[in-house]
């Protein structure tokens, strides 16, 4: 199915150009992740590999954090800025509420505001991460620690983050898929060979012969579990709830009824990315505070709540996913606008009053779908973390549920976009021929 779709797509010049453009942008990003920031002692980075929050930071940075590259911040500042801007549109700041109702013009203003906020956050995160990692690496990370060096590193990191954000926007505008998701997707995929190598070394290298059988059984169970997660995730991400729609005025030959499809998980994978981004930065801050000698009870409690390696941290992570799923579901689908659009087009839901009645019906339905979606996302995300505690898996494997969610959801989104374009092209081609 996938390869046939790709084969059909490559036959069309415009589609082929979009796919190749997306691949090119991802390659540019991957090249940037290999360039360590000047002034950084690369050898000191090895002291940071065992930090519990590093895998989460690497996840949201597209795997650019491990070698402290110029793209180390990734799209994390932009993600946080997006959350802030979306919250400000919820009757918190009149100007942002007004922009949210201005259509395309308002969207451009909101995007510009998001970029400015992201730039400020990028500088703040750059300062925090550089100073924090220098402390955690026993003051060896910054090769020549002085104001000028710190300023240069922070400027490079903030600039790198804005470049990554721009690369993501180029994918969204001129390529296929959501740019932010594609950047993170590329980083996760690039880390898969190292993850497989790590599993192989842990279970098959220098292992006594009497333990090889149990290693094969365990890895076999792991593969089956991954395949089941892939199947379950694909099923839920593609599942739809169809709302029946009828029309008051029907043109001759046109159907009198149709349906409005809503995804069972309308928020997609964005809540997982939001939760990962929000969890990672504070976890790093409290790790630094602890390293500086502030071992107060509240610091330990905060560390426990934010570290996905602990039970409390795991459930905090799941809670954030649930919270952002409800939030982003209503960002994606506005019940008031949906009811208004249906009424304008002369459509209605059988048994539901147009206008306010339809809005209330949609709100109630979206809350139910968000409940299903949030439980699904939370379950898939924390399942491997639970398995880590039971089977002693590595932190990288423990984040496999989150990684699989992003990979599968991004892949499905790209395929749907590709299918939609090919279908539209066939339809337009048919209409042109008939004329």
Swiss-Prot record:
The keyword Repeat does not apply. PROSITE patterns: SECY_1 (PS00755). It is found in: Cell membrane. Its main location: membrane. GO terms for biological process: intracellular protein transmembrane transport; protein targeting; protein transport by the Sec complex. The chain crosses the membrane at residues 19-39, 68-88, 116-136, 147-167, 179-199, 216-236, 269-289, 311-331, 372-392, 395-415. It comes from the Bacteria. It is a multi-pass membrane protein. SUPFAM superfamilies: Preprotein translocase SecY subunit (SSF103491). One of its GO terms (cellular component) is plasma membrane. InterPro entries: SecY, SecY/SEC61-alpha, SecY_CS, SecY_dom_sf. It holds the Pfam family SecY. Disulfide bonds: none annotated. Component of the Sec protein translocase complex. Heterotrimer consisting of SecY, SecE and SecG subunits. The heterotrimers can form oligomers, although 1 heterotrimer is thought to be able to translocate proteins. Interacts with the ribosome. Interacts with SecDF, and other proteins may be involved. Interacts with SecA. Belongs to the SecY/SEC61-alpha family. The central subunit of the protein translocation channel SecYEG. Consists of two halves formed by TMs 1-5 and 6-10. These two domains form a lateral gate at the front which open onto the bilayer between TMs 2 and 7, and are clamped together by SecE at the back. The channel is closed by both a pore ring composed of hydrophobic SecY resides and a short helix (helix 2A) on the extracellular side of the membrane which forms a plug. The plug probably moves laterally to allow the channel to open. The ring and the pore may move independently. This is Protein translocase subunit SecY. The gene is secY.
């Amino acid at each position: 199915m996938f390869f046939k779709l790709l084969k059909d797509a490559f036959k069309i010049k415009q589609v082929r150009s979009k796919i190749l453009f997306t691949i090119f942008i991802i390659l540019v990003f991957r090249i940037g992740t290999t360039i360590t920031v000047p002034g950084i002692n690369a050898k000191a980075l090895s002291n940071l590999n065992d930090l519990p929050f590093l895998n989460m930071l690497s996840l949201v940075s597209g795997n650019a954090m491990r070698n402290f590259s110029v793209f180390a911040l990734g799209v994390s500042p932009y993600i946080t800025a997006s959350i802030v801007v979306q919250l400000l549109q919820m009757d918190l700041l009149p100007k942002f509420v007004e922009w949210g109702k201005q259509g395309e013009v308002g969207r451009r203003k909101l995007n510009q505001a998001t970029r400015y906020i992201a730039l400020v956050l990028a500088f703040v995160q750059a300062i925090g991460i550089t100073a924090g990692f220098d402390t955690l690496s026993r003051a060896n990370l910054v090769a020549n620690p002085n104001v000028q060096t710190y300023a240069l590193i922070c400027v490079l990191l903030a600039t790198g983050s804005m470049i990554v954000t721009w690369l993501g926007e180029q994918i969204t505008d001129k390529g296929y898929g959501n740019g932010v998701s594609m950047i993170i997707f590329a980083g996760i995929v690039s880390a898969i060979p190292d993850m497989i190598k790590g599993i192989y070394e842990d279970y098959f290298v220098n292992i006594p012969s009497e333990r090889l059988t149990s290693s094969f059984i365990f890895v076999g169970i792991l593969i089956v579990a991954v395949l089941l997660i892939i199947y379950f995730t694909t099923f839920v991400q593609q599942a739809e709830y169809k709302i029946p729609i009828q029309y008051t005025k029907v043109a001759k030959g046109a159907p009198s009824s149709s349906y409005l499809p809503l995804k069972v998980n309308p928020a997609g994978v964005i809540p997982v990315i939001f939760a990962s981004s929000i969890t990672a930065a504070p976890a790093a801050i409290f790790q630094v505070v602890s390293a500086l000698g502030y071992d107060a009870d509240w610091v330990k409690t905060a560390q426990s709540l934010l570290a996905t390696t602990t039970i409390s941290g795991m459930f905090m992570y799941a809670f954030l996913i649930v919270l952002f799923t409800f939030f982003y579901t209503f960002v994606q689908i506005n019940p008031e606008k949906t009811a208004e659009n249906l009424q304008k087009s002369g459509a209605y839901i059988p048994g539901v009053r147009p206008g306010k009645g339809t809005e209330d019906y949609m709100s109630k339905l979206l809350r139910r779908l968000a409940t299903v979606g949030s439980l699904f996302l939370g379950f898939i995300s924390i399942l491997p973390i639970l398995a880590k505690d039971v089977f002693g898996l590595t932190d990288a494997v423990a984040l496999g549920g989150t990684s699989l969610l992003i990979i599968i959801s991004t892949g499905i989104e790209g395929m749907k976009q590709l299918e939609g374009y090919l279908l539209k092209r066939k339809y337009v081609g048919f209409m042109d021929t008939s004329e």
